[in-house]
Amino acid sequence: MIVWGGVTNGLVSPYVNTGGRYSPFRNAWTAHLTNAPLVGRADHTAVWTGSEMIVWGGVSSTLPAYPAYHNSGARFSPATDSWLSLPAYLSPTARAYHTAIWTGTEMVVWGGYNGSALNTGGRFNPSSGWSGVPVNNAPTARYNHTAVWDGSKMIVWGGTSDGTNGITRGARFLPRTGDWTATAWLGPVILPDRINYCAVWTGTEMLIWGGKKYSYGGNTSYRNDTFGYAPQRITYLYTRP
């Protein structure tokens, strides 16, 4: 497991650009990743390519009222213990609270926030650089959502566009054609909106668990339910206890 970036409890420069590597086999940490060519940040994304970790985006600030959003990134190779900066040319707009997935050949970044919610993104291929993600038929702008890769499509769901109201819709993106398709469901189960939850792809379905429903006006309710989304079963949503 490779960990990088985040926020500490320190009052001076709380955003860090260091990390570490954890070996479950040896139950030990090694290599503190202190030579990253990136400023400290949080709420960025990281994907694993099979040989490298790619870090992109995020936010940092010396004052909460003046956040600095980033559109920079870098690739870390554990084999050589070295970093390589991502090209800036054609990279997406700076953002944080976005999602990123690895398709097997490229990283797809989508959504996020940089003062307002976004419904744009980008695709990074280590061999050829950045290219865009179409906005035609793209889902509603959002952040604090989730995205998974099902082997051929990126599935996006949930999040919020204003920090108050959750979104209960999503979409599937097919990189091969550049097409977006809205998700839908059948049956009596309606998936409650939420943010700050987790989602994984099992090989056959997207599982969504936890999160919270937040309102600036008052109440915050936390979720402990699980929902599954299976595209191959005519997009049927169900719940598990």
Identify what each model region corresponds to:
Residues 1-241:
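Kelch-like beta-propeller repeat domains
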